[in-house]
C-alpha cells in the first residue's frame, strides 16, 4: 500500500531541471609558472606546454584550455600580474636555488587569493629544501613525473575546489573524496583518476540531446576533492555527506595537518589505521557509499574486505587499472550491470537511460531489489549527472522496498518524466536509436530550422520556462512531436539532382512538381523516417519552413505548401507519401505564386532555402477521418474590439476540425480570451444560426490520389452534422430548439447543433481561455511584439481528477510576429469631413499614414451583383496587379465580399500573389450581399505585416463611406468586363488608426 502511495505521489511530481550552464563558473584561464629558464624548459620537455595542454583538453572534449606565462624574477612576475589576471601560480623550485619560492612569496603577499602550488621533480636535495621552507602559502605540493596530464589534473583539482559549494547547491553535483598524504602517490593517481572521470563524462554526455547540451552536460561530472589528513577528510565528508559519490582512502596518514599549534611545530606522526577509522565512520553514517581502501601494506587487505570495503594494492604494477575497475564497478561509472544477488552473474547490461527505461520491467525481481535497496541505480544516475531522477530515487530506495513491481513503475515514471522535461525547449539532434514516443523535437542536418522550425522551438521554450502551463490536472500542454529537416538537406537535394535550372525557369507549377517528384532524396534518411513513423503512430503534417517564412519583418506565412499524410502501418507506403510530400514542399518554393511573392517583397528566389517540418497532426480518428476537437488562430492584437474589449486583449478565431478551415477564411467563432462568455456570434439566435460554422475540415485516412500542387487534395470538407455522428461536438456545441425558438448551451438530442464552444468558454469543461491568455501573454512578451499563434486541442471524454471538467491536450503549432507600422497618427479621423474622403471605414485593419498612392482599382458592382462572377473577377484583377508590379506602383483595391475566401460565394477568391501590389484593400457590402469583417488568417497576416490597409464598409447601412461616383466620373486607365482602374494626378492620403479601427482614404487637395 505504501509503495502505491509513493507511485501516486510520484505521478503528480514535477522534476526540477538542472541548468548545466550555471555550473563550473570559476575557471583557470591564465597560469603563471615561476621557474628558472632551465627548469621551465624541462617542464616543457623540448616542446610547448600550451600545445600539450591544448591537446589534452581537446582529446577529453574540454573547453577553455589555459594559457601559460613563465617568469624567473619578482620583477617579471610583477609585470605579468600588472597586465594579466592570473588564476594559478605554479612554483618550480630549482635544484640549486630557492628563487622560485621567493618569487611565489612575493606574489602571494600581493595577491593572497590566487592559489599557489609547488611542482617539482623530487630529489633528496629538493625535499630537504622544502622541509626548511615556509610552505603555508602553498595549496598543494606535487611531484613532477614528466606527464603533462598532471598539469591538467592540478588545474581541474583547483577548479573543482573553487566550484564545489556552488555546484552542489545549484545542481547536487557529486564528489569523490580522495584521502592521501603521499605527494608522490597522489601526483600519480590524480592524473589517472581525472582522465578516467573526464572520459566517462564524455560518455555520459551522450545522454544530451545535441552537441551544445553535451558539452554543457560534462560540467556535471563528479568532482575530486583531496584530503591529506584525517581531520581534513572528516571535515569534507561531514560538510558534503549528501553528495559523496564514493571515497578512496589510504590507510596510514596523519590525523591532523602539519601546522603549528600553541606556537610550536606540532609533532604530526602518521597513524597506521587512520584510514580504517575514517571509513568506519563513513560506513556507519551511510552504508550505501562505496568505499575503496588503497594501501601498500597488504596486511590491511583482509580487514578491509571483512569490513565490506574494496581493496587496491599500491604495490601492484597494475594498481591504476585495478582502481579504475573498482570505480567502474562500484562508483556508478560505465554500464549499469544488473547481477543475480546469489551468484553475482550478469543478468542485464544497461548502457544508457533509455535502455534502463526499456528494460526495467524485464529485470528479475530479486536482482532489482538487490540493487535498489543498495542505492545502486541512484548512484549510477548521479555519476551520469542525471540528478533530478537520482535524488528522487535515493529518497525512495532508502526505505524498505516491499513491492518491487510498484518500484519498477516508480523508476519508469521517473525516467519518462525526466526525458519529457529534458526534451521540452531543446532542439535535439535526431538519433534514430533513441527517438521514441517520449521524444519531442529533433533536427536532421546542421542547417537552419527555417521560420516555422524556429517558431516551434521558441514555443517549446516558452512552455518550458513557464510552468504555469502545467497547472491544470489532466491537461497536457505541448508542441506536437516534431522533426525538422534543416536547410542543408534542401541544398543537398537541389544540388545532387541538378534542379535549379528547372526550378528557376518559367515552367508551369505542375511540371516543376513532376521534376521534383522524380528526383531522389538521399537514402541515408530512410531509417530516420522509419524511426519517426514508429514513434508517432499518427498522421504527419509536412510543412514548409523557409528562411524567410515567419520572419520578424517579412512574413511568408501561407506562401508555401503544407501537406498532410495519413498514417498507415505499412512503413514503406508511409515513406513514399512522406518523401513525396517533402519534395512537393521543396517544389512549392519555385511555384509561380512564390516567385510573384518574392518579387513583391524584393527578395531573390535563389536565396530562399527551405527546411521542412515533419510534425504529428493533432487530432483524433473518427472512422475514415482525422481531426482535432478545436483549432484556433490567436492574435495578441484585436483589430475589432467590441463592447468592453480592448485591442491589447487579443482575439482568437476558433473552429471545429483542422486549422486549414480558419486559414481558408471559413466561418469561425471570434472569441476574446479575456471575455470568453461574450461571443458576438452567439448573442442572438438568428446570428448564431447564420454566422457559425456549418462545415469543417478533416484529413481523409484512406490512401488518396498522388500529390498535386494543391496541398489540400486529401482534406475533406464535411458538414458539422458528420461531427455529431463522430461524438466530437459533446463539449463544444449548443443545440437549436426549433419548437421554442431558442439556442440552448450544451449537446442535446435532436435539433441543429451550433459550434459555440460553450462548454470550454462558459462552463469550465476545459481551461481553454486561461491557456489562450497564457499563450498570448508569454508569446508576445517573448517576441517583444504582437504575435499570431496557431493552436489545436483534443478533448477527451475522461473526467479530470480534480473534478474540473475533462482531460485534454492543448498544442501550440506555430507563432509568428504581427508586424505593425510604427508611424505615429496624431489625428482624430472622425473630424475629417465626408466630402474630403474617397473612403471611410469604421472597421479597418492596419495602422499608419501613406501618401504615395495615386491609383484605384474597383469592381464595377451594381445592386444586382452576382457572386458567380467572382472567379472571373479574380483573374481580371491578377492581370491588372501584374501591371502594377511591373511599374512598381501601388493601388487601392475595392470590391464586394470577403477578399481571399476559398468559397467564391463569400467573396472574390484571390490569392495573395494576385493582389500583392495593393496598398489598401476594401471589402464593400452591397444591399443583397452583406459582409462581416474577416477573420485573422495567413492571408491577412501578410496584408497587415506589409503595412497594407484592410477596410470593411457597408455604405447601404450607413457603415462607412465609398464615394464611387468620383471614380465613375474619371476616365479609366484600364477597364475589363468587371473591373475599372483609374488614376489621380496627385497622391491620395491613406490614414489608419489601428487602435480605434478607423481608416480613411482622402481625395487629393
Question: What is the predicted function of each stretch?
Answer:
Residues 100, 130-141, 305-312:
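As written
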Residues 119-121, 293-294, 314:
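Hydrophobic/aromatic residues positioned on beta-strands within the core alpha/beta folds
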Residues 13, 42-45, 49, 65, ...:
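Conserved phosphotransfer microenvironments
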Residues 37-42, 74-76, 88-99, 123-125, ...:
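Short acidic, S/G/P-rich loop/turn micro-motifs used as interaction or catalytic elements
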Residues 479-529, 536, 843-851:
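A structural-propensity feature for long, helix-poor, extended segments
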Residues 297-423:
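Terminal, compositionally biased segments used for targeting/anchoring and flexible tails
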Residues 1-69, 133-140, 144-223, 229-231, ...:
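Non-catalytic signal-transmission and effector/linker regions of two-component phosphorelay proteins
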Amino acid at each position: 500500500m505504501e509503495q502505491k502511495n509513493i507511485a501516486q505521489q510520484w505521478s503528480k511530481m514535477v522534476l526540477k531541471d538542472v541548468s548545466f550552464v550555471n555550473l563550473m563558473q570559476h575557471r583557470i584561464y591564465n597560469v603563471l609558472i615561476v621557474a628558472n629558464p632551465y627548469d621551465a624548459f624541462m617542464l616543457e620537455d623540448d616542446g610547448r606546454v600550451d600545445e600539450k595542454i591544448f591537446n589534452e583538453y581537446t582529446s577529453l572534449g574540454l573547453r577553455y584550455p589555459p594559457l601559460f606565462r613563465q617568469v624567473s624574477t619578482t620583477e617579471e612576475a610583477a609585470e605579468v600580474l600588472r597586465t594579466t589576471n592570473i588564476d594559478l601560480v605554479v612554483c618550480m623550485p630549482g635544484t640549486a636555488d630557492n628563487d622560485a619560492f621567493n618569487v611565489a612569496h612575493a606574489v602571494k603577499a600581493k595577491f593572497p587569493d590566487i592559489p599557489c602550488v609547488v611542482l617539482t621533480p623530487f630529489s633528496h636535495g629538493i625535499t630537504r629544501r622544502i622541509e626548511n621552507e615556509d610552505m603555508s602559502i602553498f595549496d598543494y605540493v606535487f611531484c613532477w613525473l614528466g606527464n603533462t596530464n598532471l598539469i591538467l589534473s592540478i588545474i581541474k583539482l583547483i577548479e573543482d575546489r573553487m566550484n564545489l559549494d556552488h555546484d552542489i547547491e545549484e545542481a547536487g553535483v557529486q564528489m569523490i573524496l580522495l584521502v592521501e598524504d603521499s605527494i608522490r602517490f597522489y601526483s600519480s593517481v590524480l592524473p589517472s583518476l581525472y582522465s578516467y572521470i573526464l572520459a566517462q563524462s564524455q560518455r555520459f554526455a551522450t545522454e544530451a540531446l545535441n552537441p551544445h547540451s553535451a558539452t554543457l552536460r560534462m560540467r556535471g561530472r563528479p568532482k575530486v576533492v583531496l584530503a591529506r589528513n584525517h581531520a581534513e577528510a572528516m571535515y569534507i565528508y561531514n560538510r558534503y555527506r549528501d553528495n559523496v559519490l564514493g571515497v578512496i582512502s589510504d590507510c596510514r596518514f596523519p590525523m591532523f595537518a602539519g601546522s603549528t599549534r600553541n606556537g610550536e611545530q606540532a609533532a604530526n606522526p602518521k597513524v597506521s589505521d587512520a584510514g580504517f577509522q575514517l571509513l568506519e565512520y563513513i560506513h556507519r553514517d551511510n552504508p550505501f557509499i562505496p568505499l575503496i581502501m588503497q594501501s601498500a601494506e597488504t596486511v590491511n587487505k583482509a580487514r578491509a574486505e571483512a569490513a565490506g570495503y574494496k581493496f587496491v594494492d599500491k604495490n601492484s604494477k597494475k594498481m591504476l587499472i585495478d582502481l579504475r575497475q573498482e570505480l567502474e564497478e562500484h562508483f556508478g561509472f560505465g554500464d549499469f550491470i544488473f547481477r543475480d544477488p546469489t551468484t553475482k552473474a550478469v543478468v542485464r547490461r544497461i548502457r544508457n537511460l533509455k535502455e534502463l527505461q526499456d528494460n526495467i520491467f524485464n529485470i528479475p525481481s530479486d536482482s532489482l531489489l538487490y540493487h535498489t535497496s543498495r542505492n545502486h541505480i541512484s548512484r549510477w544516475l548521479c555519476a551520469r549527472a542525471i540528478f533530478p531522477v537520482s535524488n528522487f530515487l535515493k529518497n525512495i530506495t532508502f526505505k524498505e522496498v516491499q513491492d518491487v513491481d510498484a518500484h519498477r513503475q516508480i523508476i519508469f515514471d521517473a525516467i519518462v518524466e525526466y526525458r519529457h522535461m529534458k526534451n521540452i525547449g531543446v532542439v535535439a539532434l535526431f538519433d534514430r536509436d533513441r527517438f521514441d514516443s517520449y521524444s519531442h523535437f529533433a533536427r536532421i542536418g546542421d542547417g537552419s530550422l527555417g521560420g516555422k522550425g524556429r517558431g516551434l522551438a521558441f514555443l517549446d521554450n516558452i512552455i518550458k520556462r513557464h510552468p504555469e502551463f502545467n497547472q491544470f490536472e489532466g491537461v497536457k500542454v505541448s508542441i506536437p512531436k516534431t522533426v525538422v529537416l534543416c536547410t542543408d538537406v534542401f541544398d543537398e537535394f537541389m544540388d545532387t539532382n541538378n534542379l535549379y535550372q528547372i526550378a528557376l525557369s518559367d515552367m508551369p507549377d505542375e511540371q516543376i512538381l513532376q521534376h521534383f517528384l522524380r528526383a531522389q532524396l538521399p537514402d541515408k534518411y530512410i531509417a530516420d523516417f522509419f524511426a519517426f513513423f514508429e514513434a508517432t503512430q499518427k498522421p504527419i503534417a509536412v510543412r514548409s519552413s523557409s528562411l524567410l517564412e515567419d520572419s520578424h519583418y517579412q512574413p511568408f506565412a501561407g506562401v508555401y505548401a503544407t501537406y498532410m499524410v495519413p498514417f498507415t502501418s505499412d512503413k514503406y507506403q508511409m515513406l513514399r507519401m512522406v518523401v513525396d510530400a517533402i519534395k512537393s514542399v521543396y517544389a512549392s518554393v519555385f511555384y509561380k505564386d512564390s516567385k510573384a511573392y518574392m518579387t513583391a517583397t524584393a527578395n531573390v528566389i535563389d536565396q530562399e532555402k527551405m527546411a521542412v517540418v515533419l510534425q504529428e497532426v493533432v487530432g483524433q480518428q473518427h472512422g475514415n477521418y482525422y481531426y482535432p476537437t478545436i483549432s484556433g488562430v490567436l492574435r495578441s492584437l484585436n483589430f475589432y474590439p467590441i463592447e468592453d474589449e480592448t485591442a491589447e486583449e487579443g482575439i482568437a478565431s476558433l473552429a471545429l476540425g483542422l486549422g486549414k478551415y480558419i486559414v481558408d477564411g471559413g466561418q469561425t467563432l471570434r472569441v476574446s480570451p479575456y471575455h470568453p462568455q461574450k461571443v458576438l456570434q452567439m448573442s442572438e439566435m438568428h446570428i448564431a444560426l447564420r454566422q457559425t460554422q456549418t462545415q469543417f475540415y478533416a484529413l481523409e485516412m484512406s490512401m488518396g490520389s498522388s500529390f498535386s500542387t494543391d496541398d489540400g487534395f486529401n482534406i475533406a470538407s464535411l458538414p458539422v452534422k458528420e461531427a455529431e455522428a463522430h461524438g466530437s461536438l459533446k463539449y463544444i456545441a449548443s443545440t437549436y430548439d426549433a419548437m421554442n425558438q431558442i439556442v440552448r448551451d450544451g449537446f442535446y438530442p435532436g435539433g441543429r447543433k451550433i459550434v459555440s464552444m460553450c462548454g470550454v468558454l462558459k462552463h469550465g469543461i476545459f481551461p481553454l481561455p486561461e491557456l489562450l491568455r497564457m499563450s498570448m501573454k508569454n508569446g508576445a512578451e517573448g517576441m517583444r511584439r504582437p504575435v499570431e499563434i496557431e493552436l489545436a486541442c483534443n478533448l477527451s471524454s475522461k473526467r479530470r481528477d480534480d473534478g474540473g471538467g475533462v482531460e485534454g491536450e492543448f498544442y501550440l503549432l506555430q507563432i509568428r510576429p504581427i508586424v505593425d507600422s510604427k508611424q505615429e497618427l496624431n489625428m482624430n479621423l472622425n473630424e475629417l469631413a465626408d466630402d474630403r474622403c474617397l473612403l471611410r471605414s469604421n472597421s479597418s485593419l492596419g495602422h499608419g499614414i501613406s501618401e504615395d498612392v495615386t491609383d484605384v482599382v474597383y469592381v464595377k458592382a451594381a445592386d444586382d451583383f452576382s457572386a458567380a462572377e467572382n472567379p472571373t473577377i479574380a483573374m481580371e484583377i491578377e492581370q491588372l496587379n501584374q501591371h502594377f508590379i511591373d511599374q512598381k506602383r501601388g493601388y487601392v483595391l475595392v470590391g464586394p465580399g470577403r477578399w481571399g475566401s476559398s468559397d467564391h460565394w463569400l467573396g472574390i477568391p484571390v490569392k495573395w500573389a494576385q493582389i500583392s501590389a495593393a496598398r489598401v484593400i476594401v471589402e464593400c457590402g452591397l444591399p443583397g450581399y452583406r459582409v462581416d469583417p474577416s477573420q485573422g488568417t495567413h492571408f491577412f497576416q501578410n496584408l497587415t505585416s506589409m503595412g497594407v490597409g484592410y477596410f470593411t464598409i457597408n455604405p447601404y447601412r450607413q457603415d462607412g463611406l465609398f464615394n464611387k461616383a468620383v471614380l465613375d466620373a474619371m476616365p479609366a486607365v484600364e477597364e475589363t468586363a468587371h473591373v475599372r482602374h483609374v488614376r489621380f494626378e496627385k497622391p491620395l492620403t491613406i490614414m489608419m488608426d489601428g487602435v480605434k479601427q478607423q481608416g480613411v482614404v482622402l481625395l487629393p487637395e
